[in-house]
Amino acid sequence: MVDVNRFKSMQITLASPSKVRSWSYGEVKKPETINYRTLKPEREGLFDEVIFGPTKDWECACGKYKRIRYKGIVCDRCGVEVTRAKVRRERMGHIELKAPVSHIWYFKGIPSRMGLTLDMSPRALEEVIYFAAYVVIDPKDTPLEPKSLLTEREYREKLQEYGHGSFVAKMGAEAIQDLLKRVDLAAEIAELKEELKSASGQKRIKAVRRLDVLDAFNKSGNKPEWMVLNILPVIPPDLRPMVQLDGGRFAASDLNDLYRRVINRNNRLARLLELNAPGIIVQNEKRMLQEAVDALIDNGRRGRPITGPGSRPLKSLSHMLKGKQGRFRQNLLGKRVDFSGRSVIAVGPTLKMYQCGVPREMAIELFKPFVMREIVAKEYAGNVKAAKRMVERGDERIWDILEEVIKEHPVLLNRAPTLHRLGIQAFEPVLIDGKALRLHPLVCEAYNADFDGDQMAIHVPLSEEAQAEARLLMLAAEHILNPKDGKPVVTPSQDMVLGNYYLTMEDAGREGEGMIFKDKDEAVMAYRNGYAHLHSRVGIAVDSMPNKPWKDNQRHKIMVTTVGKILFNDIMPEDLPYLQEPNNANLTEGTPDKYFLEPGQDIQEVIDGLDINVPFKKKNLGNIIAETFKRFRTTETSAFLDRLKDLGYYHSTLAGLTVGIADIPVIDNKAEIIDAAHHRVEEINKAFRRGLMTDDDRYVAVTTTWREAKEALEKRLIETQDPKNPIVMMMDSGARGNISNFSQLAGMRGLMAAPNGRIMELPILSNFREGLSVLEMFFSTHGARKGMTDTALKTADSGYLTRRLVDVAQDVIIREDDCGTDRGLLIRAITDGKEVTETLEERLQGRYTRKSVKHPETGEVLIGADQLITEDMARKIVDAGVEEVTIRSVFTCATRHGVCRHCYGINLATGDAVEVGEAVGTIAAQSIGEPGTQLTMRTFHTGGVASNTDITQGLPRIQEIFEARNPKGEAVITEVKGNVVEIEEDASTRTKKVYVQGKTGMGEYVVPFTARMKVEVGDEVNRGAALTEGSIQPKRLLEVRDTLSVETYLLAEVQKVYRSQGVEIGDKHVEVMVRQMLRKVRVMDPGDTDLLPGTLMDISDFTDANKDIVISGGIPATSRPVLMGITKASLETNSFLSAASFQETTRVLTDAAIRGKKDHLLGLKENVIIGKIIPAGTGMARYRNIEPQAMNEIEVIDHTEVSAEAVFTAEAE
């Protein structure tokens, strides 16, 4: 076997007949498979042991030679080589075809490669190949045109006219093969290059296409006649198996049927040729053979597919590769693995952050080999077999051994769908009783798991390296931050939030208020014995907490706090300030002075002078975690999170908060608000009936009225709410529910959506406490049903988007430290009209500067060039009033096949500079795809007014951007830079004309009458600026402006969609994706290079080709940038393996074979496919020193010779 990890590259070419013969171990002559009585393969059949190898290890067919000692012997009786049965997966056979047959991929694909090579139309080819017409091969001295078609009748007439043998014309694949042999590649290419100089329009396009194919043949060394087969390879029998079912029947692969048809027809043709049968019969047989081979290679590509029993189309060789069930996606990109299991998950509140509970019976099965090894080592059993029996019997001693084995042996837990890399994390197993896996509650958010019946899979990393990687890189305690935005992903939720909220509440006049305690223990004792309440404000000696970072004026004093806050601060990391108020000032700058007693001051006096603080909510806990992470990194943070979790659970249990119907308040003035709304609606309808407004206006006014009524109820609800109400506490703390849930319980349900997505005018006036009427209930079902279907559709759409994103960016890896580029990206805050989508501070964090940043007023240098901008630095730059900064960006990175560390910045998942080898492309794809399900599906209608202002939003808009489609509601853009001098309206054509005066001339733009204008007369506009509202078409922008403008525009557009839905994504992720869409250029004029006009190629390859020419003093080629959608960009990748496993498998492989493409295995997918370690992370060459180095070689210091006698005498003495 070839060692896969030593592969340099992989090439695919057309197979020549001699190549096929060299693969083959013998010819398959009979269509038989297995003898149904003896169940032995038939001789010379499709499963023949002589050709393909023995069916049993080390045993020939007749049984003369058995055992491994005869290895390599060929049996003299049955002719079978004694070897492993595994060779039946590797050895191929062949069929000698009695007539040439065309390969359907090259004849039928689009464009038809055969047609382009011969300059014949696919229709003409089809007529010749399927024996409907003759083609003139050599006209000799007759006036016939070469390659012209003749019908049967014309052929006979011409023969009579010019005499037999006066010209050569044939039909069938044989004729095509003769024509292909006659193609003189060099001459044709030279001729086409000449033609290109003058041709234009359709003619030019056709010439470029032909030149492309002929050039591919010329460069790759493939011969065009190999597109016609004279010999057909037969794939190994174990790849098209035949298995016996229970009833004695056989289940066989469809390929066997297809091969059988080919062999039958081939043998019949051979017989007919022997018998010198009439031409028409032979022709018909040849045509049938052609169709049989077509069906074998790609069934259904031409004509109706050949069907098996139950009219099911048979699966041909092409179908074996295509689609989700094909070889690529089913068996190569993802495989089922051993040492795995799955079970339902349950909550494990007592686990540490890095632990998971594994049921005993699951663990013993997963770790069986390890346990068996230990049993033998401890000599409880003599050999492995006995050890295995011991485990299977369930001997008492195995449990202790299991405990030892799993210590420090991490396992991986995965929950489907794995939307981002946090969907697989490593834990240390803890043995538990029961049958459910136990999961730590804080990692649920990363997995998006809950305990309503979710299942998870568990995997065991086997090798030492795999265990080390799981422990160091994948341990759950390490994944505090979300890779998409760098915010903590392990924030407490639900009960934990509620417990800490209740704990940190304050209340005036509760029992024990004003007591003073010497330390925490005394305060807790008072609380436990009922002398002080959790919420009562008490004093504590500051000196009892010496490790806290007190200011000097605060030491040795008494501080006012609550018993709950003493407990809350007790679990905080020691260097964090004592938290009194849920705000950032207290967290970063220290405890405010107002809580400390001056000497001799009365504590009650201080308490009365203080406001009651609001408790700590979910958001505040998130900020505390982020700050903890910033200061102390992962280990301390995960320990702190466990303490926070335990405290939260403990106190939410103690608080005993419950919800009953009485907890839902009644709004006193609900009737008044609703009556007023009814009255207003009546007025609007009256105005409409009088003709004072249009129906659209009336609809908008009515819906607005009801919306305002609902908001008025909501406002009243908030004003009158009791902070001690359990529902209010849940909502306010962020544990569960929000104001809109609350207002549906206590206010009114409000307006509902109709099935068509339009808002209905009749609102639901009741709330859930009062209960809905039958009609109201019916109205509310429309929206609910639409919500369910939308979610289902959205999930599939979002998953497919993620797949395309991963595919286009999978080979983007951090490849070097610094690419040394001199370009940068000028960034400012992203705004949408007046609203800021993303602030400059957010955009600067974690990036490197390109130029130094100076204070706009004082001119002092805030930060030098090529420096990392930290969170504090970003704040400092923005506070100084800087509005734009030039940073290093993925857009301008000069690294080939990836990005450099400086252009990327920090790794958001760790908060440190990114490492070389990080697969940033895949992470970017996951970060953009994972929130896809949260985006809405709908297209917004602006209040039913003119439809051309409809804006696509949510998921469809993201797809529109990444696929570079023409947007709906497209904006008109200007091509000239200058001033808007006039906007004139033309009522007759219902359009407006916008005139822009530039330096070189006047631009005139026609805009629809209903479009909303973005510019006014006198405005200064830049090239590519939008004149009307709407989305700009990116391809058009690329023509008018440059690549960087398009990249910046696309980045801003993606961010607008996500931010509007409250999803934060780091800019760099979008940058990685957009850069992949613009990595190709199209050659316009080849100059002196040997590039072909119209070719799509990578920018780096193009610059290389030009570099050589410029050095030698020639004319360089010119090109223009191309914007490709992600699907197209994936298929245009340089790796044919990656493209073939994505979509359009046969087309990609056909093209790659003709070009003799080499896959240099740079990306992740192609390496996974061939089973090589991926070139990212620890798999990068720089981290894997494959050549063994003797680490502790014996050092020879001095070479001394000693005689034997000398030694013995020395010992004797």
Swiss-Prot record:
Ion transport found in the keyword field: no
UniProt binding sites for Zn(2+) 1: 60, 62, 75, 78
The UniProt record lists the keyword Transferase: yes
Cofactor: Mg(2+); Zn(2+)
Highest taxon listed in the record's lineage: Bacteria
Gene Ontology molecular function: DNA binding; DNA-directed RNA polymerase activity; magnesium ion binding; zinc ion binding
Any one of the GO BP annotations: DNA-templated transcription
Binding site for Mg(2+): 450, 452, 454
Catalytic activity reported: RNA(n) + a ribonucleoside 5'-triphosphate = RNA(n+1) + diphosphate
Alphabetical UniProt keywords: DNA-directed RNA polymerase, Magnesium, Metal-binding, Nucleotidyltransferase, Transcription, Transferase, Zinc
Name of one Pfam family that matches: RNA_pol_Rpb1_3
Its biological purpose: DNA-dependent RNA polymerase catalyzes the transcription of DNA into RNA using the four ribonucleoside triphosphates as substrates.
Protein name: DNA-directed RNA polymerase subunit beta'
Organism of origin: Streptococcus pyogenes serotype M2 (strain MGAS10270)
